Structures are given as structure tokens and as C-alpha cells.
Amino acid sequence: MSGLTTHILDQASGKPAAGVGVRVSRRDGEQTQWLAELRTDADGRARLVAGEDLAVGGYRLEFAIGDHFKASGLPVSDPPFLDVVVIDFAVSNLDQHWHVPLLVSPYGYSTYRGS
């Protein structure tokens, strides 16, 4: 089953990052097509693109993480060091599921190709 999903984990609290705004777009050369703008669920997860709407090519995820940390009550800089985390990646096989987790704190992040 193909498709594109994400899961955001707040490394500062050790909990899923619920309610984070995520935008997803497909990039084709100079053209950008916005596909979705949504928020993560209570478990920090979001289904971004259904399998039938996924295409081979470049994608961009934009995570509005600054708002999450401002609302968390953690001491963060103003403006936040990380406001929007942008991840550019490519889908190469439509027979696979594409999962892009984000592990994030107010001052750093990492990602990887999940399953």
C-alpha cells in the first residue's frame, strides 16, 4: 500500500507533537503544486497523500514547529530558532509506502526514511 505519511516526535517532552501544521507540495522542475495543508493528530501522525495521488518525483514537507514549541510552555527564543522545518525528498517507487518522521526539539531536528 503506497502513500505518504509523517509522524512528529517532540524530543524535548518525549511525546508526540499533536496539532502541528504540515504543508505538502509536489515539485516538478520550476512548478510547485500544493497538495495538502493539515495538522497532526493526537499521536503526532498525519496521512499526507493517498497512494492513488502519489507520483514519482520531488516533494516538500513544511512543518510549522515554531508554533508547537511556543504553545508547549518550554522556554524558547523569540523568534524561535526553528520556525518552519522544510524537508525536500523524492519518491522513486509507487509500490512502496513513504513515511517521513520528524524528530524535533526547539534547537534541532532529524529525519529519515521510515516504513
From Swiss-Prot:
GO MF annotations in UniProt: hydroxyisourate hydrolase activity
Source superkingdom: Bacteria
Classification via InterPro entries: Hydroxyisourate_hydrolase (IPR014306), Thyroxine_BS (IPR023418), Transthyretin/HIU_hydrolase (IPR000895), Transthyretin/HIU_hydrolase_d (IPR023416), Transthyretin/HIU_hydrolase_sf (IPR036817), Transthyretin_CS (IPR023419)
Lineage: Bacteria, Pseudomonadati, Pseudomonadota, Alphaproteobacteria, Caulobacterales
Gene Ontology annotations of biological process type: purine nucleobase metabolic process
E.C. no: 3.5.2.17
Residue span of region Disordered: 1-23
Residue positions binding substrate: H7, R45, Y112
The protein's assembly and partners: Homotetramer.
One Pfam family recorded for the sequence: Transthyretin
Keyword Lipid metabolism attributed: no
Protein name, as recorded: 5-hydroxyisourate hydrolase
UniProtKB keywords: Hydrolase, Purine metabolism
Note: HIU hydrolysis also occurs spontaneously, but more slowly.
Function: Catalyzes the hydrolysis of 5-hydroxyisourate (HIU) to 2-oxo-4-hydroxy-4-carboxy-5-ureidoimidazoline (OHCU).
Record has tRNA processing as a keyword: no
Family per similarity comment: Belongs to the transthyretin family. 5-hydroxyisourate hydrolase subfamily.
